[in-house]
């Protein structure tokens, strides 16, 4: 909804992973104006525990969570921008980064710098800082083809300024995490050991050895 020099909005999403049969609902809110975007998102699982293809003897389900995002550009040099994101997810063993680093109620802060020399291309460099000194450094080059613009407009550096205005960004996608973050838990596996050969008289009792088995790939 437009309010003069700024825009507010609400959105809902249904995320579904065909390969794992996981579903998640997302609710978001945004506040945009010239050279500034602010977004907030809430993620809530719709499916429960399923066998995990990532870790042996583990189950997985979508993790509940939320994030806050802010992105801005310099009015005097709209090609240069910066992003700041805070994200928080809940669960005892959540793979916010990867399955080798499962964490309890993990959170992370992401900072990015972007440079758009012309509308067709954006170069980015960022750092995602999590708990326990865990971090990721990312570099990327993104190409965005807009069918409403001519090739000359998409390669014109002067056209970048219009992209940073409220009118120029009204068709942009909302900012959210489209990847479903998963929570894991270890299944209880019971092993019963039987002797290879049993000898005795009728009516005799023999003990069975029962133990918890811990086999398969484990998280680091």
Predicted regions and their residues:
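Short glycine/proline-enriched turns and hinge-like loops at secondary-structure junctions
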Residues: 6, 21-23, 134-137
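Transmembrane beta-strand segments that form the barrel wall of outer-membrane beta-barrel proteins
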Residues: 1, 7-17, 27, 38-45, ...
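Glycine-rich loops and low-complexity Gly/Arg-rich segments
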Residues: 4-6, 34-40, 95, 148-152
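Contiguous hydrophobic, core-forming segments of folded domains
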Residues: 21-35
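A generic structural signal for short, solvent-exposed coil/turn residues
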Residues: 2-4, 30, 74, 115
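Short, glycine/acidic-rich beta->alpha junctions
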Residues: 18-23, 104-105
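N-terminal "first-domain core" detector
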Residues: 31-40, 73-78
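Flexible, glycine-rich linker and terminal segments associated
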Residues: 46-83, 87-103, 108-110, 114-124, ...
């Amino acid at each position: 909804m437009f309010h003069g020099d700024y825009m507010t909005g609400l959105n809902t999403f249904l995320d579904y992973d065909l390969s794992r049969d996981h579903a998640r609902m997302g609710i978001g809110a945004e506040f945009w104006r010239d050279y500034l975007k602010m977004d907030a998102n809430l993620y809530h699982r719709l499916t429960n525990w399923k066998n995990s293809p990532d870790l042996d003897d583990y189950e997985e389900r979508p993790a509940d969570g939320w994030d806050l995002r802010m992105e801005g550009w310099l009015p005097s040099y709209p090609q240069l921008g910066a992003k700041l994101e805070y994200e928080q997810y809940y669960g005892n063993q959540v793979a916010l980064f990867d399955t080798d680093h499962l964490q309890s109620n993990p959170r992370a802060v992401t900072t990015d710098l972007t440079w758009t020399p012309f509308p067709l291309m954006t170069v980015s460099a960022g750092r995602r800082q999590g708990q326990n000194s865990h971090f990721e450094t990312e570099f990327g080059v993104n190409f965005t083809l807009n069918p409403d613009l001519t090739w000359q407009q998409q390669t014109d550096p002067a056209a970048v300024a219009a992209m940073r205005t409220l009118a120029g960004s009204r068709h942009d996608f909302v900012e959210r995490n489209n990847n479903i973050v998963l929570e894991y838990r270890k299944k209880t596996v019971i092993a019963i050991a039987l002797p290879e050969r049993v000898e005795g008289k009728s009516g005799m009792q023999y003990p069975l050895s029962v133990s918890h088995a811990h086999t398969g790939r484990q998280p680091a």
